[in-house]
Amino acid sequence: MEEILRKITIDEVYISPLKRRRVRWEDGSEIMEEVPHAIRPSGSMIMDAVVQILFFRRVFQINNVARILGVDPVKLAGAMQILTGMPMLDFLNIFRLRLVQEYLACTDLSLSQIAECCDFSSQSSLSHVFTKEIGCSPAAYRRSHRYRDFRFWYEW
Protein backbone atom coordinates (compact mmCIF):
# COMPACT_ATOMS: atom_id res chain seq x y z
CA MET A 1 0.00 0.00 0.00
CA GLU A 2 1.27 3.46 -0.90
CA GLU A 3 2.34 5.71 1.97
CA ILE A 4 -0.02 8.66 2.33
CA LEU A 5 2.10 10.66 4.75
CA ARG A 6 5.61 11.57 3.71
CA LYS A 7 8.00 11.10 6.63
CA ILE A 8 9.89 14.21 7.73
CA THR A 9 13.63 13.62 8.04
CA ILE A 10 16.10 15.29 10.36
CA ASP A 11 18.01 16.57 7.31
CA GLU A 12 14.90 18.53 6.29
CA VAL A 13 14.51 20.30 9.63
CA TYR A 14 18.02 20.45 11.13
CA ILE A 15 19.42 23.93 11.77
CA SER A 16 23.16 24.45 12.05
CA PRO A 17 24.41 26.23 15.18
CA LEU A 18 27.11 27.98 13.12
CA LYS A 19 26.81 31.70 12.40
CA ARG A 20 28.83 31.77 9.19
CA ARG A 21 30.81 29.38 7.01
CA ARG A 22 33.32 30.05 4.27
CA VAL A 23 32.17 29.16 0.77
CA ARG A 24 34.54 28.73 -2.15
CA TRP A 25 33.08 29.53 -5.58
CA GLU A 26 34.03 27.86 -8.87
CA ASP A 27 36.20 30.84 -9.85
CA GLY A 28 38.27 30.32 -6.69
CA SER A 29 36.88 33.30 -4.80
CA GLU A 30 35.71 32.84 -1.23
CA ILE A 31 33.19 34.55 1.02
CA MET A 32 31.91 34.05 4.54
CA GLU A 33 28.25 33.17 4.09
CA GLU A 34 25.60 33.58 6.79
CA VAL A 35 24.13 30.27 7.95
CA PRO A 36 20.33 30.60 7.99
CA HIS A 37 18.65 29.98 11.33
CA ALA A 38 15.07 30.28 10.18
CA ILE A 39 12.79 27.30 10.67
CA ARG A 40 12.27 25.63 7.29
CA PRO A 41 8.56 24.84 7.14
CA SER A 42 8.09 21.08 7.23
CA GLY A 43 4.38 21.13 6.46
CA SER A 44 3.60 20.28 10.09
CA MET A 45 2.96 22.90 12.75
CA ILE A 46 3.87 20.31 15.38
CA MET A 47 7.25 19.53 13.82
CA ASP A 48 8.04 23.20 13.27
CA ALA A 49 7.25 23.98 16.92
CA VAL A 50 9.38 21.06 18.16
CA VAL A 51 12.34 22.11 15.97
CA GLN A 52 12.03 25.67 17.25
CA ILE A 53 12.29 24.37 20.83
CA LEU A 54 15.21 22.08 19.98
CA PHE A 55 17.20 24.79 18.25
CA PHE A 56 16.41 27.96 20.15
CA ARG A 57 15.89 26.54 23.65
CA ARG A 58 18.13 23.47 23.43
CA VAL A 59 15.59 21.31 25.27
CA PHE A 60 15.79 17.60 24.36
CA GLN A 61 13.63 15.81 26.93
CA ILE A 62 10.16 14.72 25.74
CA ASN A 63 8.41 15.87 28.92
CA ASN A 64 10.06 19.30 28.78
CA VAL A 65 9.27 19.79 25.09
CA ALA A 66 5.64 18.80 25.73
CA ARG A 67 5.43 21.11 28.75
CA ILE A 68 6.69 24.07 26.70
CA LEU A 69 4.11 23.28 24.01
CA GLY A 70 1.37 22.73 26.59
CA VAL A 71 0.51 19.26 25.32
CA ASP A 72 0.45 15.72 26.69
CA PRO A 73 3.88 14.03 26.25
CA VAL A 74 2.32 10.74 25.10
CA LYS A 75 0.24 12.48 22.44
CA LEU A 76 3.24 14.53 21.29
CA ALA A 77 5.39 11.39 21.06
CA GLY A 78 2.65 9.69 19.03
CA ALA A 79 2.38 12.63 16.64
CA MET A 80 6.15 12.71 16.19
CA GLN A 81 6.17 8.96 15.50
CA ILE A 82 3.63 9.51 12.73
CA LEU A 83 5.52 12.51 11.31
CA THR A 84 9.01 10.98 11.35
CA GLY A 85 8.45 7.23 11.37
CA MET A 86 10.64 6.90 14.47
CA PRO A 87 10.10 7.17 18.20
CA MET A 88 10.35 10.76 19.44
CA LEU A 89 13.20 9.86 21.77
CA ASP A 90 15.23 8.61 18.78
CA PHE A 91 14.43 11.79 16.83
CA LEU A 92 15.52 13.99 19.74
CA ASN A 93 18.75 12.04 20.27
CA ILE A 94 19.68 12.05 16.57
CA PHE A 95 19.00 15.79 16.32
CA ARG A 96 21.05 16.42 19.45
CA LEU A 97 23.95 14.24 18.27
CA ARG A 98 23.97 16.11 14.94
CA LEU A 99 24.51 19.31 16.94
CA VAL A 100 27.30 17.65 18.93
CA GLN A 101 28.99 16.45 15.73
CA GLU A 102 28.87 19.93 14.23
CA TYR A 103 30.22 21.54 17.41
CA LEU A 104 33.06 18.99 17.50
CA ALA A 105 33.94 19.42 13.83
CA CYS A 106 33.60 23.20 13.55
CA THR A 107 34.42 24.78 16.93
CA ASP A 108 36.92 24.67 19.73
CA LEU A 109 34.24 24.42 22.42
CA SER A 110 35.21 22.03 25.19
CA LEU A 111 33.27 18.82 25.67
CA SER A 112 31.71 20.21 28.85
CA GLN A 113 30.57 23.34 26.95
CA ILE A 114 29.08 21.16 24.20
CA ALA A 115 27.36 18.98 26.81
CA GLU A 116 25.78 22.08 28.32
CA CYS A 117 24.75 23.48 24.90
CA CYS A 118 23.12 20.18 23.96
CA ASP A 119 21.27 19.50 27.23
CA PHE A 120 23.40 16.58 28.45
CA SER A 121 23.59 16.20 32.22
CA SER A 122 27.39 15.96 32.11
CA GLN A 123 30.43 15.61 29.90
CA SER A 124 30.63 11.91 30.76
CA SER A 125 26.99 11.40 29.79
CA LEU A 126 27.66 13.05 26.43
CA SER A 127 30.78 10.91 25.90
CA HIS A 128 28.91 7.71 26.75
CA VAL A 129 25.95 8.42 24.43
CA PHE A 130 28.16 9.74 21.62
CA THR A 131 30.51 6.75 21.70
CA LYS A 132 27.61 4.29 21.82
CA GLU A 133 25.65 5.90 18.96
CA ILE A 134 28.41 7.25 16.69
CA GLY A 135 30.96 4.49 17.28
CA CYS A 136 33.92 6.58 18.38
CA SER A 137 34.77 8.94 21.21
CA PRO A 138 34.07 12.66 20.84
CA ALA A 139 37.84 13.32 20.86
CA ALA A 140 38.42 10.81 18.05
CA TYR A 141 35.53 12.31 16.07
CA ARG A 142 36.98 15.82 16.48
CA ARG A 143 40.45 14.66 15.38
CA SER A 144 39.12 13.03 12.22
CA HIS A 145 36.45 15.60 11.24
CA ARG A 146 37.78 19.04 12.16
CA TYR A 147 39.90 20.99 9.69
CA ARG A 148 43.24 22.07 11.08
CA ASP A 149 42.32 25.66 10.12
CA PHE A 150 38.66 25.36 11.19
CA ARG A 151 38.58 28.96 12.49
CA PHE A 152 39.22 30.12 8.91
CA TRP A 153 36.19 28.13 7.69
CA TYR A 154 33.60 28.62 10.43
CA GLU A 155 32.22 31.19 12.87
CA TRP A 156 30.04 30.12 15.77
Predicted features and spans:
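Alpha-helical bundle regulatory/interaction domains
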Residues: 1-55, 62-63, 67-74, 83, ...
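DNA major-groove recognition helices of helix-turn-helix
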Residues: 83, 100, 133
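Pre-recognition alpha-helix immediately N-terminal to the DNA-recognition helix
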Residues: 44-49, 92-102
